[in-house]
């Protein structure tokens, strides 16, 4: 809003990292955020989904940049044991990351596979009652994240808004990203290099169990992700 009133400039740009109206309930704050897309700025967006939204829904002139990862940290390694293990990007303080949905999905998967191990990272979840065995890493360094991905057969990363950097990092570490379906994801991930799931705990659990039962399918996706 300040930039809209600032006129001593040749051009005005808007760095759009996510669809910020989705950060709020559909009320005043949602409208305030959405209105910023109608102020005539030129958009620079994180990824193609946001570029298309800005162009098609708001008439904004917009260009995008693609995602990447730090190849000095996220490197392909082989999992060193046969223990079934999954990673979940757990962010209960960030509603758009679907913490509750992911927890329900993993709980259902654990019921089907009682020997499953789960690694949480993204936030400290020690105050939550979690019925299955898990490691609570909390907020960690990129190197700890990379080491965690390598240990896991699959990494569950759910998002209701723009895709995070995690799927690329997971693939770079020779693990398999399990991502929620939608145009906000499929501009970068697809059913060749990732596992795409609905926003349904039972469907997520069934899908992940199926890949555990068919490791050759999982290996194919892992290879294409690299």
At which residue positions do the language-model features occur?
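Conserved catalytic-core segment of nucleotide-activated headgroup transferases in glycan assembly
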Residues: 56-57, 69-133, 139
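Conserved acidic donor-binding segment of nucleotide-sugar-dependent glycosyltransferases
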Residues: 191-202, 210-215
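A short, well-ordered alpha-helix in the C-terminal region of glycosyltransferases
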Residues: 217-226
